[in-house]
Curated annotation (Swiss-Prot):
This is Nucleotide-binding protein CLI_3561. ATP binds at G8, L9, S10, G11, A12, G13, K14, T15. One of its GO terms (molecular function) is ATP binding. The keyword GTP-binding applies. Displays ATPase and GTPase activities. It holds the Pfam family PapZ_C. Keywords: ATP-binding, GTP-binding, Nucleotide-binding. Belongs to the RapZ-like family. GTP binds at D59, I60, R61, G62.
Length: 294
């Protein structure tokens, strides 16, 4: 089990760090009191491997919390629990700028002087920083760059290319565009099997309908160009930190053309090693509602 304790200066990026760890599959808990760390660790280890990666954000500004944290860390070491400390740091100038931009009050500056609060917190956290296994200074890092730094330290690099989960979703425009779509493609320009008497009753999952849709030159040109575009977009989406991508493909009713095209795109992505799911949202919608045009 990998057990990471995340701490550091206020405004240095702890919230973004925990989000990045969550994207990497860590079970994350924010602001757990240090006294509860031993019991939490024991509970996680007793899951028999169901929880393999844990990250805790610990807020230890108060003096009593320091004693509690060091006692808890001592207990973990004595009991054989391995842990790592990730410390987030930043320069005074950058922290002041971030607090001013967010219009937040520093938690240790009751007099309103941000710099005084930062100085006090920096002194209190010095011993924790000295014990840290990894220190990330976020002064010059954008959100994406911090995420990349987290991935470099805590990511499973042999699996990183598969962390973007793709869903190819067919739908019918008459039933509404899926609200969670990232990309939407309209295939109503393709020849419609609905108007072919012997195909009307079938769906795009049936070979005879799929063969009909894919038999046209315009269909193959569209699929090829869409695949080329996805080959360009997917690695760039991942580079920017995206972990889920929903590609929605729509026709009129969501039963014939969109289903056939979605299946073609799904198979193409799958053959390239992507982690991809397929869903035909409206394939039976018109049958259930007694609709006509598909």
């Amino acid at each position: 089990m990998r057990f990471v304790i995340v701490t550091g200066l206020s405004g240095a990026g702890k919230t973004q760090a925990i989000r990045s760890l969550e994207d990497l599959g860590f079970f994350c808990v924010d602001n757990l009191p240090p006294t509860l760390i031993p019991k939490f660790a024991e509970a996680c280890y007793q899951t028999e491997g169901k929880i393999k990666k844990i990250a805790l954000v610990i807020d230890i500004r108060g003096g009593k919390f320091f004693d509690d944290l060091f006692e808890s860390l001592k207990y973990l070491k004595e009991e054989g629990y391995k842990y790592e400390i990730l410390f987030l740091d930043a320069s005074d100038e950058v922290l002041i700028k971030r607090f001013k931009e967010s219009r937040r009050k520093h938690p240790l500056s009751p007099d309103g002087r941000i710099l005084n609060g930062i100085s006090m917190e920096r002194n209190r956290l010095r011993e924790v920083k000295d014990r840290a296994d990894n220190i990330i200074n976020t002064s010059e890092l954008a959100t994406r760059e911090l995420r990349e730094a987290i991935n470099e330290i805590y990511g499973e690099h042999d699996q990183i290319e598969n962390q973007l989960i793709i869903t190819v979703l067919s739908f019918g425009f008459k039933h509404g565009i899926p609200l969670d779509s990232d990309l939407v493609f309209d295939v109503r320009f393709l020849p419609n099997p609905y108007y072919i008497k012997e195909l009307k009753q079938y769906s795009g999952k049936d070979k005879k309908v799929s063969d009909y849709v894919m038999s046209f030159d315009v269909t193959n040109k569209f699929v090829n160009r869409l695949e080329d575009m996805l080959d360009f977009l997917i690695p760039n989406y991942f580079k920017e930190g995206k972990r889920q991508l929903i590609i929605s493909i729509g026709c009129t009713g969501g039963r014939h053309r969109s289903v056939a095209i979605a299946n073609a795109i799904y198979e193409g992505l799958k053959s390239k090693g992507h982690k991809v799911n397929i869903d035909h949202r409206d394939i039976n919608e018109d049958i259930h509602k007694g609709g006509k045009k598909l």
